[in-house]
Structures are given as structure tokens and as C-alpha cells.
Amino acid sequence: AVPHGRHAATTPTMAVAAPEAPEAASDAPPPPPVHMPTNDESEELLKIRHTTAHVMAMAVQKLWKDAKVTIGPWIEKGFYYDFDMPPLADKDLRRVKKEMDKIIQQKLPLLREEVSAEEAERRIREAEEPYKLEILEGIRERDPDAPITLYHMGGMPGTPQHRWWDLCAGPHVEHTGMLPKDAIALESIAGAYWRGDESRPMLQRIYGTAWQTAEQLAEHQRLVEEAKR
């Protein structure tokens, strides 16, 4: 017979352990590496760096009216520009970058113009840019009949929109608004003799770096700091 009533025997209950949750991975997978393009593989990056050098030169000449420009090429990881002007301090880089950001926000078009060497000389003399005159003379010595290429920012000469120009073969972006200002940084100041000639004036060289994205800039800066250790 089956026991019943209040005196019936009871079967003790057993606690059942809940299944263990799978252990979380101890280490999250590393983020994918940031692709760092080169000038050779990215014409867009090359244009960004070249145009940024022009924007920097325009900013410097706006802040220091008597500054004279020389050359401003792109280099492996950025650009530089040499100026004949009073010595700069590191704090001046912030002023220049702030002015550059304003120029970028204005979305000034970059316009190409071909002129004769005689017309280029006239404009350079009018602008009182002696170093550009030396550069022009070098071009004429190599090829007396070569047309001279100028790049203008804002508009063509003689128009109210014209802001700045340089003796330059390009290439450039279509307008300054295409420059990613959060991927641009001014890095350092150095002295450099014009043409490497110690008998010539000591120029102020501003080095900068420019990339396509802020992530690339951050990675570049991380690698620079890592190399210092």
C-alpha cells in the first residue's frame, strides 16, 4: 500500500545545480590594423598633402604679412614649407593651424592657370617674392619655352574671390573643403638654408602631416611616439 495522510513518508528534494555559463573570452580580439596609405598608392593622399602645404603657406602669409615663400613640397608622411620670416616658436603652430582651419571651412577652389615665363616673372616681381623668382629662373634655364603653371585659391587673378597663388605644377584637390582638417597636424619647426647654402638667409621650415582620416593621423602620431622610446 502507498502511505498516505499526514504521517506519510516524504521524499527529500535535491537541489539541482544550474549549468555553468561558458567562460568569457579572456582577451578580446585586437582591432584590425589601420591602413596607412602612401603617396605612391594614393593620388588622393598626395593631393591632400600638396594642397595642405599651400593652405599652410597662405595662413602664414596672412598672419605674417612680410613672410616670403620659397618651396612647399609633399614628403613621405606629410609636407613642409620654407619661409623667409622672423623665427617661429612652437606656440605659433597653433595659430597657423587655426587659420588653416578657417581656410578649409571656406571651401576655396583651386584653379590652374598656364602663363608665359614673362607673365609669371611680372606677377612674381609685383608680389615681391624673390625666392619664387629664383625658382622661375631655374625653370627657364632648363626649358626656355616651357609654359609656367600657377595655382590660385579662391578665384582667378583680378576677381574679388582671389585669395592667394603659387608657382606650382600640382596636383591639388578641387577646393579646400576637401581637406580633412581633423587628419592634419603641424608637427615641428626647423631652420633651413635656402638651397642648402649657408651664405643665404636661414629660413623657417614648418613640417606637417596630413592623412585621409583622423584614425590614420592618430596611428601616425602613435607610431611617432613609439619610435621615441
Which residues does each PLM region occupy?
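N-terminal chloroplast transit peptides
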Residues: 1-2
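Short hydrophobic alpha-helical segments enriched in small aliphatic residues
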Residues: 5-8
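Auxiliary tRNA-acceptor-end handling modules of aminoacyl-tRNA synthetases
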Residues: 16-23, 27-48, 59, 68-71, ...
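Metal-associated gating/positioning segment near the N- to mid-region
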Residues: 62
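Short, glycine-/polar-rich solvent-exposed loops and beta-turns at beta-strand/coil boundaries
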Residues: 73-75
